[in-house]
Amino acid sequence: MSLLIEQARYHLSAHNARQLPDDGGYEVAFAGRSNAGKSSALNALTRQNALARVSKTPGRTQQLVFFQIQPERYLVDLPGYGYAKVPQDLQAHWQAFIDRYFRTREALRGLVVVMDIRHPLKDYDLQMLGYAAERGLPAHGLLTKADKLGRGQQMQTLQKVKKEVTSRFGDSVTVQTYSGQSRQGVDELRGIVGGWLGLIAEPLAEH
């Protein structure tokens, strides 16, 4: 499975619904607040240093970027959200586009919500998880930058987030800690994503 994930290549960028690929197969979307580490996580997942651009300008990713693993199997990088310098009209456009994507995209099989472990479950994160819950899709909370906390703090935050998402969304959301620096949690993330993409028999899940 990991070798297949590593075959991911840039396919296209969509600024509106007309530019999306045909709605078939399997897609896993990655969402996260600006600078939560979403691009870095995609790069670690695929073992590629520059698959997803790591922008130094928060909020710069303003398109849906599709990375193709196999025909009809994609990783989808959603626009970073929650950055005040993005103009209001552009924020409204992306809100409507993403809303339509989540509500109508049949190929979407799961959502990874990337959150800085020091600031998890902000309003936008909960909104993304809510989209998945409304569609009956599984979601996975990726608590990034875990190396910024001690092991005890990591586990405390992990348990707190698990409790919160379970109370809100039931058992459709799994959660893990992750560090791009130490590569902590990369294999667990691959198990989840590979399962949703149909690349392995069952996704690894930690509730």
From Swiss-Prot:
Its cofactor is Mg(2+). Mg(2+) binds at S39, T61. InterPro entries: G_ENGB_dom, GTP-bd, GTP-bd_ribosome_bio_YsxC, P-loop_NTPase. One of its GO terms (cellular component) is cytosol. GTP binds at residues 32-39, 59-63, 77-80, 144-147, 178-180. One of its GO terms (biological process) is division septum assembly. Keywords: Cell cycle, Cell division, GTP-binding, Magnesium, Metal-binding, Nucleotide-binding, Septation. Residues 24-199 form the EngB-type G domain. GO terms for molecular function: GTP binding; metal ion binding. HAMAP family: GTPase_EngB. Necessary for normal cell division and for the maintenance of normal septation. Belongs to the TRAFAC class TrmE-Era-EngA-EngB-Septin-like GTPase superfamily. EngB GTPase family. This is Probable GTP-binding protein EngB. It comes from Xanthomonas oryzae pv. oryzae (strain KACC10331 / KXO85).
